[in-house]
Structure formats: structure tokens, C-alpha cells
Amino acid sequence: LGGTAIGTGINAPVGYVALVIPKLAELSGVPVTAAADMIAATCDTGAFVDISGILKRIASKLSKISNDLRLLSSGPQAGVGDIKLPARQAGSSIMPGKVNPVIPEVVSIACFEAIGNDAAITMAVEAGQLQLNAFEPLMAWALHKSLRHLAAACRTLQINCVEGIEANTVLLDARINESVTLVTALNPLIGYEKAAKIAKAAIATGKPIAEVAEDLGIMSREKMQALLVVDTLTAPGALRAS
């Protein structure tokens, strides 16, 4: 503001910038400041890229969270099913009882839009010539949409999804007790080869790893069950022989 055509300030009244900038800050409630270099600011619209890049990073993370929620809630019988998302629609018109993860899906849609807007803003910034940046309307519009839609996506994800998530405790407990991957924690105690032997036998027979370890004479069932406690397995460090 105040640089006029190419940043020199030609034809702008003397003192114009010093008068207008504080007034804009007062009216908007935003700490607006004048550009330190008017010519550089007129040539370069890189600030749009900076802000849009931050929004793209937020969008990629937000969509990743939504993807995780969709995967963890998949089911109820043919998916992961670790968690239950609140039902926000009646579900499928041809599959009774099916509940779709519509909130994570709509959040991902907003994220895809913001990522696409970032590409459009980048191209619009790059397409400027000297002090002429004819595509600033696109930059402003795309950035405005990204800000609005990502903010709305965050709110709806919190209110309509995250706050209503329930853990499928029965299924999770069963998986913890039956998981073959628990032998990973035994590596420091019995070594990789014996742990792998237990895992392969458990997969082949369908037996719990504690039972298999006892059958193979590697460790008693009672000792293994005492070692493979959830609180211990979810803390830093390695299992040690008592």
C-alpha cells in the first residue's frame, strides 16, 4: 500500500503511508505494517506462498489423521475395528447397518482442496512479470477458501467425530492377549531366533504365544504372562529377567 505502480510511490501524497497504515491497523484490529521495501513487495507475492505452504502442511497432517480414523474404525467385521466413530448418517441405502466415516471423509475433502489451492497459488505467484502480478485475485480467493474450509474442517472433526470416539475395548483386549507380535518384547530375554520360533509356531497352530513358548520349553506360561503386561509393553525400555 502506497507503492503505487512499481513501488516507488510516485503520485502518492507525501505522508500517505504513515497516515493510512495506522488507521488500517486500528479499523481491522490487525497489526498492519508498511512494507520495508516497496519495490520488492510490489515485485514479489511470495508471502502468499508462505502462508499457503503452512496451510498445506496443516492439511496434509489433518488428512493423515482422518485416514487413520477411517482405518481404525473400519469394520465392524472385515476391518480393523479398534474404535467406533459416532454415526452421523443413516449409512448405506443398500447395506443395512453400515455406518460410513463421513466426517473424516469430508475433512479429507477440505484438505485436498487446500493442497490443490496451494498448487494454484504457487503457479499464480510464479506467473507474475516484473512488478505486474495480475493473478493476485486468484491468490487471495484460493487462500481465503483454504483458511475458511480448513478452520471449518477442524471444528467439525472435533465436535462431530473426535469427541464421540469410543474404544472397542472387548476387541482390543482380545487382540492384546492373542497378538503374536508381543514376542517382539521378548527379544532381549530369549533372543531373536527363539522369539521368531514362538511366533511362527503360534501362527501355524493358532495357539496363544504363552502356550507355545511353554510347549517349546522356552519359557513357562506363567512367567510369560507376568512379563507381557500392557503397562510394561507401552513404556520405554526393554524387558529384563527378574
Predicted features and spans:
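Conserved, well-structured ligand/cofactor-binding cores
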Residues: L1-S242
